[in-house]
Amino acid sequence: MKKLVLASGNAGKLGELRAMLAGVALQITAQGEFGVQDVPETGLTFIENALIKARHACLMTGFPALADDSGLIVDALGGAPGLYSARYAGTPTDAAANNAKLLEMLRDVPAGRRCARFYAVIVLLRHAEDPQPLIADGCWEGEIAFEPCGSGGFGYNPIFFDPLYGMTAAQMGAELKNKISHRARALERLRDCLHTFMA
């Protein structure tokens, strides 16, 4: 069984990725189990940040690495918080503060103009100098609620409302969320490549 390092220190993200990859015959190990710390995300795009994280994990562990970068894109805010989703309200990262800041920024934006999407890109590097990384992305369309609702998930989940299901991401069960989320869609696109990778 091949070993794959998940290049993330985010426990919520790590749990989601592990759950979604449960059926794949890989030994998945978090980078923290190797003593690897998060690397600064200095890229200008989600893809660049995912590559930076995957390359760092490969260099530090000697194993193939899977990394994702994701964020919330709000049309009424010109794409913010975008790349800065985790640090929107400043550092250290604080989900409740991020949610509060976003709701404040949208205070005067009416229903129907609060369109948003979660976007994720997932990168798989076979080794640190892999010239042909496997890259997949996924998007989850929704809108920003007027107040937090639900206790599941993490990050912006309490204020990200999916009109098709009539609930926020935080109100969804993990099974549903892990089928329709931006990460789930990106992983689904990467799944065939993972089977080739394992061969």
Curated annotation (Swiss-Prot):
SUPFAM superfamilies cross-referenced by the UniProt entry: ITPase-like (SSF52972)
Documented EC number(s): 3.6.1.66
Active site residues of this protein: D69
Catalytic activity entry: XTP + H2O = XMP + diphosphate + H(+); dITP + H2O = dIMP + diphosphate + H(+); ITP + H2O = IMP + diphosphate + H(+)
Cofactor note: Binds 1 Mg(2+) ion per subunit.
Cofactor (UniProt): Mg(2+)
Enzyme class: hydrolase
UniProt entry keywords in alphabetical sequence: Hydrolase, Magnesium, Metal-binding, Nucleotide metabolism, Nucleotide-binding
UniProt binding sites for Mg(2+): D69
GO biological process: nucleotide metabolic process; purine nucleoside triphosphate catabolic process
Binding sites annotated in the UniProt record for substrate: S8, G9, N10, A11, G12, K13, S70, F154, G155, Y156, N157, K177, H182, R183
Keyword DNA repair carried by entry: no
Gene3D superfamilies: 3.90.950.10
Gene Ontology molecular function terms on file: dITP diphosphatase activity; ITP diphosphatase activity; metal ion binding; nucleotide binding; ribonucleoside triphosphate phosphatase activity; XTP diphosphatase activity
Pfam families: Ham1p_like
Gene Ontology cellular component annotations, sorted alphabetically: cytosol
Protein family membership: Belongs to the HAM1 NTPase family.
Function: Pyrophosphatase that catalyzes the hydrolysis of nucleoside triphosphates to their monophosphate derivatives, with a high preference for the non-canonical purine nucleotides XTP (xanthosine triphosphate), dITP (deoxyinosine triphosphate) and ITP. Seems to function as a house-cleaning enzyme that removes non-canonical purine nucleotides from the nucleotide pool, thus preventing their incorporation into DNA/RNA and avoiding chromosomal lesions.
Quaternary structure and partners: Homodimer.
Protein name as annotated: dITP/XTP pyrophosphatase
Classification lineage: Bacteria, Pseudomonadati, Pseudomonadota, Gammaproteobacteria, Lysobacterales
